[in-house]
């Protein structure tokens, strides 16, 4: 499994050896335009793009883009997807916070990101993380939106990470019905994003 991005002085290849089937994440390699030599560029081993589950996405866009010889890309780590960059063989965060960056564009130092942040359906944000659209304000006005509280459970030597979404009117110490939802995907993660199905329950 491989994909590529055109850099100024080299072709950047994101490739996985398939050792763990579809669960194998990629590393970065570069192909020099002059010599055609392929060399390792950065060991990464994390997912490219977002795999944060959600049911309110509308379309999509690019998950990676070259600017000169710098790669900007979305990557899922643990329970969220943020924007990172690969420069001179090193990966560093650009804009990472709770939620999911779903797609973005970058030009002349400016960015526009489509993200699921702050328990809202997709909105557009600039390179500082400032929200620039208000597509969903009217839909959410006057509605209760449960905030996902992280929950970690340990069974033997294995830790399970999850969230609790408390119902409207929840009172500590008072019993209430519970819906227990386990995702079965090998790559999908639940994260702190607006998920209509879970809010509806």
Descriptions of predicted regions:
Residues 2-4, 61-63, 100-106:
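Repeated scaffold domains used in trafficking and secretory/extracellular systems
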Residues 6-8, 66-68, 106-108:
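Residue-level detector of Asp-centered blade-edge/turn motifs that repeat once per structural unit
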Residues 9-11, 71, 111-112:
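Hydrophobic beta-strand positions that form the internal "hydrophobic ladder"
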Residues 32-36, 86-90, 127-128:
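Short loop/turn segments that connect beta-strands within beta-propeller blades
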Residues 38-45, 92-96, 129-137:
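Beta-propeller fold detector
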């Amino acid at each position: 499994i491989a994909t590529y991005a055109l850099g100024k002085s080299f072709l950047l290849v994101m490739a996985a050896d398939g050792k763990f089937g579809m669960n194998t994440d990629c590393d970065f390699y570069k192909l020099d335009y002059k010599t055609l030599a392929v060399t390792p560029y950065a060991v990464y081993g994390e997912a490219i793009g977002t795999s944060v589950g959600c049911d309110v996405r509308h379309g999509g866009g690019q998950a990676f883009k070259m600017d000169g010889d710098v790669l900007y890309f979305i990557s899922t780590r643990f329970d969220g997807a943020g924007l990172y960059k690969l420069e001179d063989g090193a990966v560093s965060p650009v804009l990472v916070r709770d939620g999911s960056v779903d797609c973005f564009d970058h030009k002349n130092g400016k960015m526009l990101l489509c993200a699921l942040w702050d328990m809202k359906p997709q909105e557009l944000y600039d390179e500082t993380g400032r929200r620039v659209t208000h597509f969903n304000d009217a839909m959410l006005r006057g509605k209760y939106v449960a905030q996902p509280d992280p929950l970690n459970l340990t069974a033997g030597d294995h830790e399970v990470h999850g969230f609790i979404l408390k119902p409207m009117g929840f009172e500590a110490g008072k019993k209430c019905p519970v819906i227990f939802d386990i995702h079965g995907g090998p790559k999908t993660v639940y994260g702190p994003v607006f998920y209509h199905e879970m809010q509806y329950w």
